[in-house]
Amino acid sequence: MATNGEEQQSQAGRHQEVGHKSLLQSDALYQYILETSVYPREPECMKELREVTAKHPWNIMTTSADEGQFLNMLLKLVNAKNTMEIGVYTGYSLLATALAIPEDGKILAMDINRENYELGLPVIQKAGVAHKIDFKEGPALPVLDQMIEDGKYHGSFDFIFVDADKDNYINYHKRLIELVKVGGLIGYDNTLWNGSVVAPPDAPMRKYVRYYRDFVLELNKALAADPRIEICMLPVGDGITLCRRIQ
């Protein structure tokens, strides 16, 4: 018969193995949050998209339901209207954003894979918010560089959400800080990166976790030292760092 310690270790192992979208060490506590306050208030269209995404082989890439709820409320609190999203996947966080912003709000959405986006697009269209989305397929950096060169986009975005290639987060930040307005927010997802940011370098990790770990650590250090922003790192989902531009 397993001891309590063995059971806890086994639960922790399963927690990591399934790529859990929460840093809570108790699966029961996370399920309580989802079943008590997230799923009962989740819009039907977001539930449908979440269930569609769950069948995709890369479903670990999606935004968690609790983080989607958080983003939706945050956007309403800051009255965001002109937004950007880098890294779309099937569009769960994109739909959360589209539902939160006003009818004439806009989202510039960028991802290297249109096929994944089109998996969720019928749900987005059925929700009546597809007209708010300008989707661009391809790398985001050239688009950002062109926007900065044009000049008219400086300080024009109320909110920007980044959930893409972690090895480019620093490069995104260098550009996005010019495009978000003073008082606007940038949200960087996965900044606690499966909890690996506090793990010893030789700790057992999945290959992709180990590969991106140093890039996430570099980003966190850079954001903490950037005088142009105020920051708040939250243990929601896989960690999200909010950056408010102050100068």
UniProtKB/Swiss-Prot annotation:
UniProt pathway annotation: Aromatic compound metabolism; phenylpropanoid biosynthesis
Pfam families noted in UniProt: Methyltransf_3
Residues where a divalent metal cation binds: D163, D189, N190
Entry binding sites for S-adenosyl-L-methionine: T63, E85, G87, V88, S93, D111, A140, D165
Catalytic activities: (E)-caffeoyl-CoA + S-adenosyl-L-methionine = (E)-feruloyl-CoA + S-adenosyl-L-homocysteine + H(+)
Coiled-coil features, chain-numbered ranges: none
Similarity annotation: Belongs to the class I-like SAM-binding methyltransferase superfamily. Cation-dependent O-methyltransferase family. CCoAMT subfamily.
Superkingdom, taxonomy of origin: Eukaryota
Function: Methylates caffeoyl-CoA to feruloyl-CoA and 5-hydroxyferuloyl-CoA to sinapoyl-CoA. Plays a role in the synthesis of feruloylated polysaccharides. Involved in the reinforcement of the plant cell wall. Also involved in the responding to wounding or pathogen challenge by the increased formation of cell wall-bound ferulic acid polymers.
Gene3D superfamilies: Vaccinia Virus protein VP39 (3.40.50.150)
Protein's UniProt name: Caffeoyl-CoA O-methyltransferase
The UniProt record lists the keyword Transferase: yes
Cofactor comment: Binds 1 divalent metal cation per subunit.
Any GO MF annotation of the entry: caffeoyl-CoA O-methyltransferase activity
Cofactor: a divalent metal cation
